[in-house]
Amino acid sequence: PEIVAAFETAKKPGAALHLMGLLSDGGVHSSNEHLYALVDAAVAAGVPRIMVHCFMDGRDVPPASGAGYMAELVDHLERAASKAPDGAPCEISIASVEGRYYAMDRDNRWERVERAYDAVVCAEPFRDLAAVAAMEASYGSEVTDEFVEPVALDARGMRDGDAVIFFNFRPD
């Protein structure tokens, strides 16, 4: 019922659905399949704007495997958007990318979490890059998945009236 309620909220004029969590098939904190199922369900429900915030792993999977996961996600999002019911508009974006070091800090280090928060909520810092290019730029700077610097790839940010689903399944 809560997921359906989030979809209904996101269908209101000007609203968006934000999906956030670890982009990994490591199976410890999340599953890519759960993310894909949420995207597909939101599209089928007629949610017109879906924004995905990718927390990169690098601990439960190899440290530079994120670009591959990102490419798979991009492919899935493109296919999903094309399946919107009755030709309804469906805009799906990868809105931010950040390493789990920032987005999933368990040690109360606000300076880390604040950087992820700014990328997710405020869309700062914004970079006009494709998601896979953002990962490749990180690798080019010798920064692996866990430590990817938080960056917004969609300038909209989060707004009052938006819906948020956090898809990690481990509580910490």
Task: List each language-model region with its residue ranges.
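…; additionally, a secondary subgroup of soluble metalloenzymes is captured
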Residues: 1-172
